[in-house]
Amino acid sequence: MGLLTVLKKLKQKEKELRILMLGLDNAGKTTILKKFNGEDISTISPTLGFNIQTLMYKEYKLNIWDIGGQKTLRSYWRNYYEENDAVIWVIDSSDIRRIDDCKFELKKLLEEEKFAGASFLVFANKQDLDGAMTSEEISKYLDLEQLNTHHWEIMSCSAVTGLGLEEGIDWVVKDIVSRCFVLD
């Protein structure tokens, strides 16, 4: 293998990003990925364990790990904490009764040293439903303004309509690239 081939492989590897997608069960993590990938979203079942979706976005290969959010699976989340460039936390904006549970799990997640420096996107999902909290309300309730350990953004979205999905992924990729790569 020649030096040029090795350099090309290294360059391709640089353009590969690992993103961890977490949130409580029924937040819409799998639906977001399927919608973004142009797949059918009419029959989604709960994720038992994890799914890995590889998406091409601009010139980047995104390996997105979608981890089930059921209470019985949350203790296993830490098995996926290594070497992530970003975390996407998905919230069901219409499920006000579980916002305290969401805040508790998010706080534990943000205390993990393995995520230090990772880009952090909160998708305020299900904005298409009546009574959904706004991204501003969620940000305030979750105290995101106090978050100074990560680059972060909150984005309103709907996995059903596609609202905000591309903008969110675009922010994640740009934030990772601005921190990790020297632009050509």
Swiss-Prot record:
GO CC list: cytoplasm; microtubule cytoskeleton
Keyword flag Phosphoprotein: no
Family: Belongs to the small GTPase superfamily. Arf family.
Pfam families in alphabetical order: Arf
Organism: Dictyostelium discoideum (Social amoeba)
Binding-site list for GTP: 23-30, 66-70, 125-128
Gene Ontology MF terms: GTP binding; GTPase activity
SUPFAM superfamilies per record: P-loop containing nucleoside triphosphate hydrolases (SSF52540)
Stated name of the protein: ADP-ribosylation factor-like protein 2
Free-text function comment from the UniProt entry: May be involved in trafficking events within the endosomal system.
